Swiss-Prot record:
This is Acyl carrier protein phosphodiesterase. Keywords: Fatty acid biosynthesis, Fatty acid metabolism, Hydrolase, Lipid biosynthesis, Lipid metabolism. GO terms for molecular function: [acyl-carrier-protein] phosphodiesterase activity. It comes from the Bacteria.
C-alpha cells in the first residue's frame, strides 16, 4: 500500500492518519518521539505493509514481473494499488468524495508537521500541493512517480522499467486489487489491522 491506501485504511479504522503517513520516515521505536495515537498509527502502517506483502494475490502479482524488475515489484505494486483505489474511489467510498477526503487527510497530517522529520515535511509539501492522491488515477502520473523514485534512489533504477510490467498485467492486477482490498477495508472497520 502507498499513501492513499494507508490514509484510507487508517480512516476506516479510526486510527491516526498522521501516524499512518509518517511511518515510512520513522525507524525503530516511535514511542519516545510521538504521542500515543501517532505511535499506534505508525504500528498500524507497519502491520499493513507486512500483511499486504504476504497476501496471496500480491505474492502472485510479484511473480508477473520480469527478472530485471522483480526486486522492485513490491514498491511498484504499492503505487499501483493506490492507482486502483484512486481510480475506483467513487465505488469504494461513495459517501466521502476523494477531494473531500484529501482535504480531511491533509488537515489531520498538518498537525504533526512542526515536529516531523525534514524528509516527511518535504514530502508533504509536494503530496498536497501537487495533488498526488487525486492524480494516482492517471497511469501517466504513476509512471512519473516510479521515475521520480528511481531518480532519487539510483539503486531503485529498475522502477523505471517496472512500468512495463504494470502495463502488461493491468487487468489482472486490477482483478487482484478487487480480491483483497475490500477484505482489508472490512478488517480496518473492525479494527483488525
Amino acid at each position: 500500500m502507498n499513501f492513499l491506501a494507508h490514509l484510507h485504511l487508517a480512516h476506516l479504522a479510526d486510527s491516526s492518519l498522521s501516524g499512518n503517513l509518517l511511518a515510512d520516515f520513522v525507524r525503530g521505536n516511535p514511542a519516545t518521539h510521538y504521542p500515543p495515537d501517532v505511535v499506534e498509527g505508525i504500528y498500524m502502517h507497519r502491520r499493513i505493509d507486512v500483511m499486504t506483502d504476504n497476501l496471496p494475490e500480491v505474492r502472485e502479482a510479484r511473480e508477473w514481473f520480469r527478472h530485471e524488475t522483480r526486486r522492485v515489484a513490491s514498491i511498484t505494486l504499492d503505487v499501483m494499488w493506490d492507482h486502483f483505489l484512486s481510480r475506483h474511489w467513487t465505488q469504494i467510498s461513495p459517501d466521502f468524495p476523494l477531494q473531500a477526503f484529501v482535504g480531511y487527510a491533509h488537515a489531520q497530517v498538518a498537525t504533526i508537521l512542526p515536529d516531523s522529520p525534514p524528509r516527511f515535511v518535504n514530502l508533504n509539501d509536494y503530496l498536497w500541493s501537487e495533488k498526488w492522491l487525486e492524480r494516482y488515477r492517471d497511469m501517466d502520473f504513476i509512471q512519473n512517480v516510479l521515475n521520480g523514485m528511481a531518480n532519487r534512489r539510483p539503486r531503485l533504477d529498475a522502477l523505471r522499467d517496472s512500468w512495463y510490467d504494470l502495463d502488461a498485467h493491468y487487468d489482472a492486477l486490477e482483478e487482484r486489487f478487487w480480491h483483497f482490498y475490500p477484505r482489508m477495508m472490512a478488517q480496518a472497520a473492525r479494527k483488525a489491522l
